Amino acid sequence: MAHKKGTGSTRNGRDSNAQRLGVKRYGGERVKAGNILIRQRGTKIHPGANVGRGSDDTLFALIEGIVTFERLGRDRKKVSVYPLAQTAMQPVAAE
């Protein structure tokens, strides 16, 4: 009869945290400058107009505006932020 307990699988029993990658702001959404648009590994989606790229390939808005996803050639995508229409921002004068 054994007098020691079995230790089991000591090399198992851990898991890494999820990286929470993906699109954070979708097409048609209004964003402010500095908002993160996409968290990604590598340039799966490329930066377009008014979009910056961080050192970890995160794409973020450089201006306030509306997010749009576009094609870049045949097999690539890009994300751009276009400014809001100037007429929508100005108050309407009462007569």
Curated annotation (Swiss-Prot):
One Pfam match: Ribosomal_L27
Superkingdom field: Bacteria
Disulphide connectivity of cysteines: none
Gene3D superfamilies linked: 2.40.50.100
Signal peptide boundaries: none
PANTHER family linked: LARGE RIBOSOMAL SUBUNIT PROTEIN BL27M, RIBOSOMAL PROTEIN L27
Name used for this protein in its record: Large ribosomal subunit protein bL27
Organism: Gloeobacter violaceus (strain ATCC 29082 / PCC 7421)
Phylogenetic lineage: Bacteria, Bacillati, Cyanobacteriota, Cyanophyceae, Gloeobacterales
